[in-house]
């Protein structure tokens, strides 16, 4: 199955800005990989909370629509809240 997530590039980086994003129901994330520069992104929590329940979300390639470009990625790591059904941060790796 193919998944597409709309995202924006983050300009503010750090703990404080990440907390502000989470309070606004956004998820901070990063895309990295060998030979390419890391990209800090942000997307809506509702865009990922439902599709991450599917098992193939973690094993298949995802498409991130990033400012008019489609970037192919795979999920590398995902941090979840300890007891709330919330995703706190996602690490993607270039596919």
Curated annotation (Swiss-Prot):
It comes from the Bacteria. The keyword Secreted does not apply. InterPro entries: Rbsml_bL25/Gln-tRNA_synth_N, Ribosomal_bL25/Gln-tRNA_synth, Ribosomal_bL25_short, Ribosomal_L25_dom, Ribosomal_uL5_bac-type. It holds the Pfam family Ribosomal_L25p. Belongs to the bacterial ribosomal protein bL25 family. One of its GO terms (cellular component) is cytosolic large ribosomal subunit. Keywords: Ribonucleoprotein, Ribosomal protein, RNA-binding, rRNA-binding. This is Large ribosomal subunit protein bL25. Part of the 50S ribosomal subunit; part of the 5S rRNA/L5/L18/L25 subcomplex. Contacts the 5S rRNA. Binds to the 5S rRNA independently of L5 and L18. One of its GO terms (molecular function) is structural constituent of ribosome. NCBIfam families: PRK05943.1.
């Amino acid at each position: 199955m193919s998944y597409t997530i709309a995202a924006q590039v983050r300009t503010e980086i750090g703990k404080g800005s990440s907390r502000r994003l989470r309070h606004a129901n956004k998820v901070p994330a990063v895309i990295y990989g060998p030979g390419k520069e890391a990209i800090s992104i942000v997307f809506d929590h509702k865009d990922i909370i439902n599709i991450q329940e599917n098992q193939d979300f973690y094993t298949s390639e995802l498409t991130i629509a990033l400012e008019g470009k489609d970037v192919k990625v795979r999920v590398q790591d995902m941090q979840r809240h300890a007891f709330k059904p919330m995703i706190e941060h996602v690490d993607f790796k270039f596919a």
